[in-house]
Amino acid sequence: MSWQTYVDEHLMCDMDGHVLTSAAILGHDGSVWAQSAGFPELKPAEITAILNDFNEPGSLAPTGMYINGAKYMVIQGEPGVVIRGKKGSGGVTIKKSNMALIFGLYDEPMTPGQCNLVVERLGDYLIEQGY
């Protein structure tokens, strides 16, 4: 299965009638493995800050997290495993696997819980597969 198939069929899937706004799978070096249409381009400093928060949980909380210059308030995730952010009526969930970062961005009517479920389910699967 290609990385694009994981994005198209497992991240951009219908969740109770709602779909993520955009999604992507990136390597820890920031390289894009696959992404949906409309996924924002991440700047190198933004990827570095996200990876730093996985290594030092809480480091993003004081300043917020930035995705393509848009600021997200960091909300409780799972230290070292999941980062969650909120911006207006939407937000982001980022799951870290051994080799990848799985991003899901959403807006209402999708809920944070639905986004978390979609992103974390794929992340857990990739971890089980050694990725």
Swiss-Prot record:
SUPFAM superfamilies, per the entry: Profilin (actin-binding protein)
Alphabetical UniProt keywords: Actin-binding, Allergen, Cytoplasm, Cytoskeleton, Disulfide bond
Gene Ontology BP terms: protein homotetramerization
Tissue: Expressed in pollen (at protein level). Expressed in pollen.
Cysteine-cysteine disulfides: 13-115
Record-linked InterPro entries: PFN (IPR048278), PFN_euk (IPR005455), PFN_sf (IPR036140), Profilin_CS (IPR027310)
Pfam families reported in the protein's UniProt record: Profilin
Subcellular location: Cytoplasm, Cytoskeleton
Domain of life: Eukaryota
Entry GO CC: cell cortex; cytoskeleton
The keyword Nucleotide-binding appears for this protein: no
GO molecular function: actin monomer binding
Assembly, per entry: Exists as monomer and tetramer. Occurs in many kinds of cells as a complex with monomeric actin in a 1:1 ratio.
Function of the protein: Binds to actin and affects the structure of the cytoskeleton. At high concentrations, profilin prevents the polymerization of actin, whereas it enhances it at low concentrations. By binding to PIP2, it inhibits the formation of IP3 and DG.
Family of the protein in this entry: Belongs to the profilin family.
Name recorded for this polypeptide: Profilin
Organism expressing this protein natively: Crocus sativus (Saffron)
Taxonomic path: Eukaryota, Viridiplantae, Streptophyta, Embryophyta, Tracheophyta
